[in-house]
């Protein structure tokens, strides 16, 4: 007996009727069953009836599968698909604001709906796609009323001076000041169209506009006196942020007053000694400049612990002047730092642009001075003591010689410049020949002046570095052979 076995591929008898394809189906985890009504008037304005019966005197469009709870533009949606005769391979979704469908193999997404009005209605559709490329002909749909979120603007952290850093409740600047802020809009930062700023007054006509993606502005030629800066932003729907201002009495960590100082003379004294709370060193430099230049013929800048947030302001402050006298701390603690290293780029630009710099760094936190390259460096007093009557000789003229008038109780440096980096180099002071108790050999330099070649036909300004302290915050230190004012008299009469 022969038995024939066969397998019916089609699993039904009538081969003339092909099997019916099962299309995939799509589901959203959120199911909305309400209806929103919309109406457009003759001027093109759209009105909605949400969670209320529409006025029967008008013709309304109906938006089904809607939520009547007003939400924000940030929407997190989840979905899934099923296919009885195959496998769901992905999904296509589209918002009512989109012109095309977008494919994804994910089953969730976070969306920021591009709202352009204070209140608008958006619908979301998603349909599954199976392994044969078939698509759900009836996408799952959701309609959402979305309210515009107001944008936010706040000053960048530390972009305004802290009272702790400047040692005062008043911030003093020269006529250039940069303000920096951060922008945020829940509806997407691209919806922020305008930033407005004002000085001293917030009247309707007092605001100036810049583009909505700007996060800073540099104000120049600010008039001397007390000022307040205001800034706000606006989104495409017309919603505005709260006004941010500096100074702000509600923020007691920041400076509580902003004073713009006039630019006096073409010489700037930079006080980089925050621990000199009594300003004894500054008073000494001021008195010296009164003698050399005359009163009101120079300006001074008390930096405190931190430079301005924007290097643009540092550069601008220096460039107001022809010559800068920058003195650093005699001795720092962990709570205070010199700032000249962080000003390096601005100092280099100043010198290369023709400005003259005298700088007196004592506590060397870094020796890679771009503005004065060093070949080598030694500690003159490893025991931290440089005693009185030690002579500092000038190879230029012995009448310029200085000597230690009060104990220098910090470690100080001698150095040798990297001559290959300079177009010209002049030693102004070196240590006298050592005796048996001294910690140096030979005559290490302690004050030198260099100049760079910027172009084949142009030289830079002159930069002078002095590594012995001229003042310790209590008294001058190099007055044992006459006042050290003679150093500055020489510089201003012969070099600067």
Identify the role of each PLM range:
Residues 277-371, 376:
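Helical hinge/lid and interdomain linker segments adjacent to catalytic or ligand-binding clefts
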Residues 11, 264, 437-496:
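Extracellular ligand-binding/catalytic regions of CAZymes and related secreted enzymes
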Residues 4, 8-262:
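Low-complexity, disordered linker/stalk regions enriched in Pro/Thr/Ser/Gly
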Residues 274-275, 331, 364-366, 434, ...:
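Short, solvent-exposed loop/turn segments at secondary-structure junctions
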Residues 37-39, 190, 275-281, 436-438, ...:
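Short, solvent-exposed loop/turn elements at domain surfaces
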Residues 265-275:
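Short beta-strand segments enriched in small/hydrophobic residues
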Residues 330-432, 483:
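A glycine-rich, often tryptophan-bearing local segment used as a flexible ligand/cofactor-contacting loop or short
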Residues 270-272, 360, 466:
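Short hydrophobic segments within beta-strands
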């Amino acid at each position: 007996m022969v038995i024939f076995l066969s397998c019916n591929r089609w699993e039904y008898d009538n081969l003339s009727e092909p099997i019916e394809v099962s299309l995939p189906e799509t589901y959203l985890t959120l199911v909305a069953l309400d209806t929103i009504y919309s109406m457009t008037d003759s001027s093109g304005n759209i009105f909605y009836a949400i969670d209320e019966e529409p006025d029967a005197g008008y013709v309304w469009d109906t938006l089904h599968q809607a939520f009547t709870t007003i939400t924000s533009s940030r929407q997190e949606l989840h979905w899934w698909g099923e296919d009885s005769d195959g496998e769901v391979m992905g999904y296509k979704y589209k918002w009512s604001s989109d012109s095309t469908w977008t494919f994804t193999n994910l089953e969730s997404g976070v969306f920021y709906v591009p709202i352009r009005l204070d209140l608008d209605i958006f619908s979301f559709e998603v349909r599954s796609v199976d392994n044969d490329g078939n698509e759900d002909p009836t996408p799952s749909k959701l309609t959402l009323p979305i309210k515009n979120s107001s944008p936010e603007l706040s000053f960048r952290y530390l972009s305004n001076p802290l009272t702790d850093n400047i040692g005062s409740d008043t911030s003093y600047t020269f006529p250039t000041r940069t303000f920096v802020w951060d922008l945020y809009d829940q509806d997407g930062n691209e919806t922020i169209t305008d930033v407005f700023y004002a000085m001293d007054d917030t009247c309707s006509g007092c605001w100036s506009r810049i583009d909505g993606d700007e996060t800073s502005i540099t104000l120049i030629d600010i008039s001397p006196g007390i000022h307040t800066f205001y800034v706000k932003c606006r989104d495409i729907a017309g919603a505005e942020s709260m006004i941010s201002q500096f100074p702000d009495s509600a923020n007691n960590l920041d400076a509580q007053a902003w004073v713009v100082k006039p630019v006096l003379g073409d010489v700037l004294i930079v006080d980089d000694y925050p621990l000199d709370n009594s300003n004894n060193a500054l008073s000494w430099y001021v008195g010296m400049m009164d003698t050399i230049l005359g009163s009101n013929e120079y300006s001074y800048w008390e930096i405190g612990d931190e430079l301005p947030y924007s290097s643009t302001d540092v550069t601008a402050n220096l460039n107001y002047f022809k010559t800068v006298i920058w003195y650093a701390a005699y001795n720092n603690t962990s709570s205070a730092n010199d700032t000249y290293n962080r000003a390096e780029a601005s100092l280099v630009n100043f010198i290369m642009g023709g400005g003259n710099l005298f700088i007196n760094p004592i506590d060397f936190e870094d020796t890679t001075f771009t503005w004065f390259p060093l070949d080598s460096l030694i500690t003159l007093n490893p025991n931290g003591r440089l005693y009185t009557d030690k002579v500092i000789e000038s190879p230029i003229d012995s009448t310029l010689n200085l000597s230690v008038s009060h104990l220098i109780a910090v470690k100080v440096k001698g150095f040798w410049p990297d001559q290959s980096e300079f177009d010209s180099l002049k030693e102004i002071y070196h240590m006298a020949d050592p005796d048996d108790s001294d910690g140096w050999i030979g005559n290490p330099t302690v004050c030198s002046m260099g100049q760079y070649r910027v172009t084949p036909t142009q030289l830079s300004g002159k930069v002078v570095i002095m590594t012995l302290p001229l003042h310790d915050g209590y008294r001058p230190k190099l007055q044992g052979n006459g006042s050290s004012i003679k150093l500055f008299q020489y510089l201003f009469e012969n070099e600067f």
